[in-house]
Amino acid sequence: MVGEMETKEKPKPTPDYLMQLMNDKKLMSSLPNFCGIFTHLERLLDEEISRVRKDMYNDTMNSSSNEKRTSELPDGIGPIVQLQEKLYVPVKEYPDFNFVGRILGPRGLTAKQLEAETGCKIMVRGKGSMRDKKKEEQNRGKPNWEHLNEDLHVLITVEDAQNRAELKLKRAVEEVKKLLVPAAEGEDSLKKMQLMELAILNGTYRDANLKSPALAFSLAATGQAPRIITGPAPVLSPAALRTPTPAGHTLMPLIRQIQTAVMPNGTPHPTATLMQQAPEGGLIYTPYEYPYTLAPATSILEYPIEASGVLGAVATKVRRHDMRVHPYQRIVTADRAATGN
């Protein structure tokens, strides 16, 4: 009908969808020019991430979110009070189990999720609550660090009206007690979800059905099947640079003359036996272009001529520089040789 808004169904809380939301949040925070501009967009993105994580956590812990929605908090009656409760961790019964990591989660996400759902503040206190053992020993006995003398426990605090605070504290205690029950190896669904969240935060998450997170992101965004990429075309052999047959006349006809030359006494030329080749190999062709072809003999006019000679005369004296002349060589003339200077 006209005037009615079409309500779209929210995406299902899947790891791929959570990875897309985390990538969008990381992209927005990495752009300094857009930081703080799209306030509503950032708020909606944070709310969607919180909703997806909450639904995934509820599915993991086998708890019904519908029951939590029906049990809404009543209106506050009376003044604001502060309530707290300690839940001791069964470290002695399960000494090898990592309860601290199970309660806090990767980068504290599990504890933050519980705080957002229950409205209580959840903290791990006591011996072994700090990751740095040296720092824990240094702080032991100092003011505000008295809890280090107690056994490992979870401290739950809440501030609200009396009736609301009691309900919040009760829900938080129930949720934390579920985390204090160790699951069998390989059946801990919460641990699997925490490892998956850690992989998403580090950018190393890979879906079991897909090859890479980039492919998972593209398929989840477009909803299309993966396209098959064909292999490269076979490499063709390069074309011949020159034809095997000669393209012109012979450039060295002198070889044929030597092969058929005969001495005046009737004997064959001495070099004819050395030049005997197969009938098809009697001619030699140059494989190069014009600048590299055989050049004719150098003309005598290319050499320098003495100044005393006359060009074209019969008795022209040609000076050929077989050896390099020293540039500082002293020339001794006939008159200087007679005087000794």
Swiss-Prot record:
<dbReference type="GO" id="GO:0042802">
    <property type="term" value="F:identical protein binding"/>
</dbReference>
<dbReference type="InterPro" id="IPR004087">
    <property type="entry name" value="KH_dom"/>
</dbReference>
<keyword id="KW-0221">Differentiation</keyword>
<keyword id="KW-0507">mRNA processing</keyword>
<dbReference type="GO" id="GO:0008266">
    <property type="term" value="F:poly(U) RNA binding"/>
</dbReference>
<comment type="subunit">
    <text>Homodimer; does not require RNA to homodimerize.</text>
</comment>
<dbReference type="GO" id="GO:0048024">
    <property type="term" value="P:regulation of mRNA splicing, via spliceosome"/>
</dbReference>
<keyword id="KW-0810">Translation regulation</keyword>
<keyword id="KW-0217">Developmental protein</keyword>
<dbReference type="GO" id="GO:0014028">
    <property type="term" value="P:notochord formation"/>
</dbReference>
<keyword id="KW-0539">Nucleus</keyword>
<dbReference type="Pfam" id="PF16544">
    <property type="entry name" value="STAR_dimer"/>
</dbReference>
<dbReference type="GO" id="GO:0160091">
    <property type="term" value="P:spliceosome-depend formation of circular RNA"/>
</dbReference>
<dbReference type="GO" id="GO:0003727">
    <property type="term" value="F:single-stranded RNA binding"/>
</dbReference>
<dbReference type="Pfam" id="PF22675">
    <property type="entry name" value="KH-I_KHDC4-BBP"/>
</dbReference>
<keyword id="KW-0813">Transport</keyword>
<dbReference type="GO" id="GO:0003729">
    <property type="term" value="F:mRNA binding"/>
</dbReference>
<comment type="function">
    <text>RNA reader protein, which recognizes and binds specific RNAs, thereby regulating RNA metabolic processes, such as pre-mRNA splicing, circular RNA (circRNA) formation, mRNA export, mRNA stability and/or translation. Involved in various cellular processes, such as mRNA storage into stress granules, apoptosis, interferon response, glial cell fate and development. Binds to the 5'-NACUAAY-N(1,20)-UAAY-3' RNA core sequence. Acts as a mRNA modification reader that specifically recognizes and binds mRNA transcripts modified by internal N(7)-methylguanine (m7G).</text>
</comment>
<dbReference type="InterPro" id="IPR055256">
    <property type="entry name" value="KH_1_KHDC4/BBP-like"/>
</dbReference>
<dbReference type="InterPro" id="IPR045071">
    <property type="entry name" value="BBP-like"/>
</dbReference>
<dbReference type="InterPro" id="IPR032367">
    <property type="entry name" value="Quaking_NLS"/>
</dbReference>
<dbReference type="GO" id="GO:0005829">
    <property type="term" value="C:cytosol"/>
</dbReference>
<keyword id="KW-0509">mRNA transport</keyword>
<dbReference type="Pfam" id="PF16551">
    <property type="entry name" value="Quaking_NLS"/>
</dbReference>
<dbReference type="InterPro" id="IPR032377">
    <property type="entry name" value="STAR_dimer"/>
</dbReference>
<dbReference type="InterPro" id="IPR036612">
    <property type="entry name" value="KH_dom_type_1_sf"/>
</dbReference>
<dbReference type="GO" id="GO:0060034">
    <property type="term" value="P:notochord cell differentiation"/>
</dbReference>
<dbReference type="GO" id="GO:0051028">
    <property type="term" value="P:mRNA transport"/>
</dbReference>
<protein>
    <recommendedName>
        <fullName>KH domain-containing RNA-binding protein qki.S</fullName>
    </recommendedName>
</protein>
<keyword id="KW-0694">RNA-binding</keyword>
<feature type="domain" description="KH">
    <location>
        <begin position="88"/>
        <end position="154"/>
    </location>
</feature>
<feature type="short sequence motif" description="Nuclear localization signal">
    <location>
        <begin position="324"/>
        <end position="330"/>
    </location>
</feature>
<dbReference type="GO" id="GO:0048710">
    <property type="term" value="P:regulation of astrocyte differentiation"/>
</dbReference>
<dbReference type="GO" id="GO:0006417">
    <property type="term" value="P:regulation of translation"/>
</dbReference>
<keyword id="KW-0508">mRNA splicing</keyword>
<dbReference type="GO" id="GO:0030903">
    <property type="term" value="P:notochord development"/>
</dbReference>
<comment type="similarity">
    <text>Belongs to the quaking family.</text>
</comment>
<dbReference type="GO" id="GO:0045650">
    <property type="term" value="P:negative regulation of macrophage differentiation"/>
</dbReference>
<dbReference type="GO" id="GO:0005634">
    <property type="term" value="C:nucleus"/>
</dbReference>
<keyword id="KW-0963">Cytoplasm</keyword>
